Amino acid sequence: MSATPDTRPIADTATHPTADAGTHPTADAATHPANPVARKTIISGLSIHTQMSSVAGAPVVYLLGDVADNSPIQVPEGVCLVNVGVDLWEENFSPWCAPRVFAKGPNFGDGAQKTLDTLINQVIPWAESELTDPPAYRMLVGYSLAGLFSLWAGVTQAGVSPQVARGCQPGAPAAPHVDAPATTFQRIGAVSGSFWFPGLLDYVDQQLSGGVVGLTHAYLSLGDREARTPNPQIMHVRENAELLASKLENAGITSTFELNRGNHFQNVEGRMQKALDWLVK
């Protein structure tokens, strides 16, 4: 469901000492002793933690979430992991402006394009600077609103949406951006994603009709209780997820939709692990 402070999975402060408890999912770094090259930095406000493989052509997972060292999420030996910590999710993961869906939650901004540009133009060059060869493929994976961002980025890579170009205020100038190469992220995971987000279905239709070059795999999932809500916006989340998976598959993108047990808050790390296992197989 939503990634607002009222609905995000609660971070475990015992294992995530730098996280703001109650604000982000606990989908973070993996213990990966086979990949000894680990670095940390902050790039344009994003907290970056890398564990890079020395294997030539190793795939790279860009995992959206808080940076931590003790998460049980694992990636296979020979796969690189880049954790990307992002604050202000409703601003930085939202592709275009939209009203709040909870009375106490904030409105949604239009910062996703800026976040995507930062990933492509700053984070990726820094993270992959020590690789001997380009990665075989890159994956972008996120939970909740970060999952929405992963899906949006996967179909937006070659351009910018008209919603973003307009800005949040009437008459606002177009937001500056750098068009992403069509093949930046070949695989995406949207885990318990905010598939209810207004305008998402139409936007994906628009992008797919123009041909999405480069995206080859998409993993979508939800909990089987996530649609059981009186909220008129969120109650369609499962229907939308199934439609999105079908649209992606029909566009020639290898796609799957997995229904897990529980609501939005249950087994966050287990669901993220399922996504990674599917994407790297």
List where the protein language model places each region.
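Non-catalytic cap/lid and distal C-terminal segments of serine-dependent acyl enzymes
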Residues: 3-5, 32-281
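Long, intrinsically disordered low-complexity tandem-repeat segments
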Residues: 7-32
